[in-house]
A protein has these predicted regions:
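N-terminal Rossmann NAD(P)H-binding glycine-rich loop of SDR-like oxidoreductase domains
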Residues: 20, 28
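Catalytic loop of short-chain dehydrogenase/reductase
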Residues: 107, 113-127, 138-176, 191-194
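Conserved mid-core segment of classical short-chain dehydrogenase/reductases
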Residues: 98-113, 239
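Flexible N-terminal pre-Rossmann segment of NAD(P)-dependent oxidoreductases
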Residues: 1-16, 240-244
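C-terminal helical subdomain
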Residues: 172, 179-244
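A glycine-rich helix->loop->beta "capping" turn
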Residues: 59-62, 81-95, 101-102, 218-219
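Conserved glycine-rich Rossmann-like NAD(P)H-binding loop of the short-chain dehydrogenase/reductase
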Residues: 35-50
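Rossmann-fold cofactor-recognition segment
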Residues: 55-74
C-alpha cells in the first residue's frame, strides 16, 4: 500500500539537467506536483516544445524550460549564474543525466566510445556539480541519479559501470568536502519502468524519493530504490533521519 508522502516545495527552485529524458520526466512531474519551480535545460526549442507537450497539463507556470548547453564547464557555469540572477537563487539540483550503452568488451571499445560513454558524461556531471553546489541553499540538496551498474560489472557495457562508479565517488567526495554546509546524495536505481522500458521501479517512485531528499533535512548519503516498497521505505527513512 502506498502511504501519503506529499511534500510542499512551494517556491523551491530545482534545476533538473537531463529532465527531458525518460527518468527525468518522472522527476520533473514529481517536483511540479510538490509545487516547486522546476528549471529544465534542453538542447533546442523543438525539444522544449516536445517535452511540454509530453507533460500535458502537468506543464504549468512552475515549469521553466531553458535552451542551454550545460555539457561543458563554461556552459554549466553560465546556466547556473543565469538561474541565480533571474530566480534569486537555487535550492536543489537533481541530475538524471545519461543513458545506456552497449558496445562490446573493454578490449574492443574505440576512442569515440570512450569519449561518448565515459568522458563526456562524467564531464557533464562534474560541470553541473562544480557550478551549482556552491550556490545551493542550505535547505536544498544535490542529487545524482545512477543505476545498479555503478556497483556491479556489466560485461559488454563496462563503460557504463565505470562512469556510474565514478559518479558514486563524486558524490562521496562532494559530501565529504561539503560537511554540513551542503547535502549531497546518490539515488541508486534498479531497472526503471518508463515510457521507454519496463522495470521494477517506476519513474514516479524515483521522482517521489528525489522530492523527499530535497524536502527533508536528512544528511548526505546514498539511497537505493528498486521497487515501490523500497521507495516508500526510503521516504520514511529520510523523514526519520531529518528528525534525528
Amino acid at each position: 500500500m502506498t502511504t501519503v508522502t506529499t511534500f510542499d516545495l512551494t517556491g523551491h527552485r530545482v534545476l533538473i539537467p537531463g529532465g527531458t529524458g525518460a527518468v527525468g520526466e518522472g522527476v520533473v512531474r514529481a517536483f511540479l506536483t510538490a509545487g516547486a519551480e522546476v528549471i529544465v535545460p534542453t538542447r533546442s526549442e523543438g525539444r522544449s516544445t516536445e517535452f511540454r507537450s509530453l507533460l500535458g497539463d502537468a506543464a504549468d507556470e512552475h515549469l521553466h524550460l531553458i535552451v542551454h548547453d550545460y555539457t561543458t564547464f563554461a556552459g554549466a557555469k553560465d546556466l547556473v549564474e543565469q538561474i541565480v540572477r533571474f530566480r534569486g537563487g537555487l535550492d536543489s539540483v537533481v541530475a538524471p543525466i545519461g543513458g545506456w550503452w552497449q558496445g562490446g568488451l573493454l578490449t574492443e571499445i574505440s576512442e569515440d566510445d570512450w569519449a561518448s560513454a565515459f568522458t563526456e558524461l562524467a564531464t557533464t556531471h562534474l560541470a553541473i556539480l562544480r557550478a551549482a553546489l556552491p550556490h545551493l541553499a542550505a535547505k536544498g540538496a544535490y542529487t545524482v541519479i545512477v543505476g545498479d551498474s555503478a556497483t556491479r560489472p556489466v560485461p559488454g557495457s563496462g563503460l557504463v559501470s565505470m562512469e556510474q562508479a565514478a559518479l558514486l565517488m563524486m558524490q562521496r567526495v562532494a559530501a565529504a568536502e561539503s560537511g554540513e554546509s551542503r547535502r549531497v546524495f546518490t539515488l541508486v536505481l534498479g531497472q526503471v519502468t518508463s515510457r521507454l522500458a519496463e522495470g521494477t521501479v517506476t519513474v514516479g517512485d524515483v521522482g517521489r524519493v528525489a522530492v523527499a531528499i530535497s524536502g527533508t533535512t536528512a544528511p548526505s548519503g546514498s539511497v537505493g530504490v528498486h521497487d515501490a516498497g523500497e521507495a516508500e521505505s526510503a521516504i520514511a527513512a529520510l523523514r526519520e533521519a531529518a528528525r534525528a
